[in-house]
Amino acid sequence: MKAIELKNVKKSFKDGDETIEALKETNFSVDKGKFVAIIGPSGSGKSTLLTIAGGLQSPSSGEIWINGRALNEKKEKARAKVRFEEIGFILQASNLVPFLTVKKQLQLVDKVNKAKENRAGLDLLKRLGLEKLVDKYPEELSGGERQRVAIVRALYNDPTIILADEPTASLDTEKAYEVVKILAKEAKEKNKATIMVTHDLRLVDYCDKVYLMEDGRLSEKVD
């Protein structure tokens, strides 16, 4: 079953008198349980596609479907609910709440979602070497540590879809591989649809499919 689908999606914007096509007409889907990567040069439209897929920005035309429901037909409050309940975002900037400790970052997810403590999320903290940092504030963490906390936070809510924009950018090689292995495991064992934008071609071996984005046009990469 398709967890996420883009139908005839385009994105353009005005730059003075010129119209820039950030994303040319795109048809793209990811099934549950699949882990796909999108590669391509900077400025090619990868992040634009990801933010549209997650409903963080609207397309100029076309449709976004999340688990069989048309996302862009919903009002913003309903879209926000779908984003929170169905999608885990891992962005290049960790966007942690500056006045909350690592532990409280995760407790905030529990509070908003009215959920019980997520044991799997706490296990992820240990797996990523963060268990001794739970009482630290973001300013006390390195860039790589903040990014790893953001990854755990994104997975903590047990979303059905994971959208990761350069999730390993600030990590060393060992931790980068560990994160990608976790994303692959989440896809396979928990039947999640996962899309990862990356520049690191060493990491795509863990993916089921690899897509190439060039000049706003997406195509499946065939070796």
Segments from the language model and where they lie:
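Helix-to-loop junction immediately C-terminal to a conserved catalytic motif
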Residues: 54
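Conserved ABC transporter NBD signature motif
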Residues: 62-70
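ABC ATPase NBD coupling module
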Residues: 71-88
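Short coil-to-helix segment of the ABC ATPase nucleotide-binding domain corresponding to the Q-loop/switch region
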Residues: 100-107
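Conserved ABC ATPase signature
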Residues: 137-141, 145-147
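A short, proline-enriched helix->beta-strand linker immediately N-terminal to the Walker B motif
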Residues: 156-160
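Catalytic Walker B motif of ABC-type/P-loop ATPase nucleotide-binding domains
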Residues: 162-165
